[in-house]
């Protein structure tokens, strides 16, 4: 019972700090250290400069300041391990521990950074006294962005990896131009504290992720992929273990009455589509990242744009996500490609795409529905002039003339297909 109380108390403190981290004062920084279980002490360096030292098992941070932290002079980080190249700088070469304390009104960014360092410290498998290291998460975090960028580039996917943006620790994936943020790759506590987390490194020659030593591991953490928006993923492509959205909404295709009069939609979905944005990945499954990113592109470039083009211009009430009145998927089911074996890059699996930011599936779901009287007017449409569209989660047909396939076509072909559909609907 006491453990549960302590966990609840810690959660309440964390939420309070996230909500209102406090202004940048020396007492507030010291209190923040106390809530995170860190030691702190102040030394007078000279008549005008003081130093606040913050220490944990591995991390030591020295903050030099003047006048009770009115002016931050410098922030330095030292690790009590053999790794001395930990990256706490942004792409401009700025020290983010310093920038998260300088010219800011509150401790929000610094609290995030300090909490992240405590996380890496707590879950690194390092014996300081003997010098033996099984898994140094400070090194892993430093190396991860380049490994991800090399892997994505080798898979010929148009994405850019960035690190330590906005004065906070973190790894993000952007579109090819580095303008639109697609997702973050985070390290978080796992629901199962006994779950092993093995170190996998990317071999650019073999173009694969390798676990070079079974001893290179820790416990109780996961990689987490977090998209910036909800994406419709086929339910049968995902195992329950990786899903973090507890009760995801189902995306239902619109009724025929919601579509333009010139469109006839045939539903060939073999799986429910779930609107999700977060996935818990064991490190041995990091090879799934290109599949997530490719599906994101398919979702954005093809699925969203097709629905945007075929939905009636005069829709007036919202398209429901419930089962009532919508065309139901056929009962054919695929087995999950993630269950009971390591995934292959040739498998069809859960993914996502980039681009066309102005129209999301959520926006489509929020579109209005035409009235019954308007629906009656459609009965007079010449059926022979309707454009037959067959939609499956992995392919779309426009009659017998055009096909767009997730598996068999590249991104250029997807865009050409959308251009063709636009020309037919003008």
From Swiss-Prot:
GO molecular function: transcription coregulator activity
Pfam families xrefs: Med1
Keywords: Activator, Nucleus, Transcription, Transcription regulation
Localization terms from the record: Nucleus
Region (Disordered) residue spans: 319-349
Entry annotated with the keyword Transcription: yes
An annotated GO BP: positive regulation of transcription by RNA polymerase II
Listed InterPro entries: Mediator_Med1
Bias (Polar residues) ranges: 336-347
GO cellular component, one term: mediator complex
Job of this protein: Component of the Mediator complex, a coactivator involved in the regulated transcription of nearly all RNA polymerase II-dependent genes. Mediator functions as a bridge to convey information from gene-specific regulatory proteins to the basal RNA polymerase II transcription machinery. Mediator is recruited to promoters by direct interactions with regulatory proteins and serves as a scaffold for the assembly of a functional preinitiation complex with RNA polymerase II and the general transcription factors.
Subunit structure: Component of the Mediator complex.
Family label: Belongs to the Mediator complex subunit 1 family.
Name recorded for this polypeptide: Mediator of RNA polymerase II transcription subunit 1
Organism: Kluyveromyces lactis (strain ATCC 8585 / CBS 2359 / DSM 70799 / NBRC 1267 / NRRL Y-1140 / WM37)
Protein encoded by which gene: MED1
